[in-house]
Amino acid sequence: MQLLEQALARFAEVYGRAAEAADVVDHTACTLATCSASGWPQVRTVLLKGYDERGFAFYTNRHSRKGQALAENPRAAVCFHWAPLAEQVVIEGVVTPVAEAEADAYWAGRPRESQIGGWASHQSRGLESREVLEQRVAEYAARFPDGEAVPRPPHWSGYRLAPVRIEFWRARPGRLHERDVYEHTAEGWCHRLLNP
């Protein structure tokens, strides 16, 4: 088995356990870290919507702060921390937009109210009042009546984080935690243990 395949299989195993754990609120939630062109770090929680050998996919408004940061600097990291399992996985890599057809397919499966919200929210921009947002929601709900498909806004899409580093961490007594990392180097993928 190739080392990247091995890392993805390990991720699938712990991700599956997190999905089944009753005390994990949302196993898909991860912290996305980006850095703007000016060097300011930014973090927020996103939801993983799929992963394979190409990378880890999430969806958002391209005009949001994270969309702008990724346009300026496509290097990013995500951290899955499943406290009830005492495990975490950190993935670093380069982010690219998903294909338009892939974004369309994901959008089509979203609940209608989320689709309307995707049109109505000017994500990360200032908001005069909650009433203004609710008015825009009502306007878009009228524009796209029940029973009709809500098209994907041009500013709404997905991103895929192609990994160059995947680190696994598991808590152990005495803070002698288990850590190991898969990294892509000039020679290909390598695997090594890390001190806690």
Swiss-Prot record:
Residue positions binding FMN: 44-49, 59-60, 65-66, 88, 123-124, 169, 179
Species assigned in the record: Alkalilimnicola ehrlichii (strain ATCC BAA-1101 / DSM 17681 / MLHE-1)
Pathway: Cofactor metabolism; pyridoxal 5'-phosphate salvage; pyridoxal 5'-phosphate from pyridoxamine 5'-phosphate: step 1/1; Cofactor metabolism; pyridoxal 5'-phosphate salvage; pyridoxal 5'-phosphate from pyridoxine 5'-phosphate: step 1/1
Primary enzyme class: oxidoreductase
Reactions it catalyzes: pyridoxamine 5'-phosphate + O2 + H2O = pyridoxal 5'-phosphate + H2O2 + NH4(+); pyridoxine 5'-phosphate + O2 = pyridoxal 5'-phosphate + H2O2
Protein name: Pyridoxine/pyridoxamine 5'-phosphate oxidase
Keywords: Flavoprotein, FMN, Oxidoreductase, Pyridoxine biosynthesis
InterPro entries tied to this protein: Pyridox_Oxase, Pyridox_Oxase_CS, Pyridox_Oxase_N, Pyridoxamine_oxidase_dimer_C, Split_barrel_FMN-bd
Cofactor binding note of this UniProt entry: Binds 1 FMN per subunit.
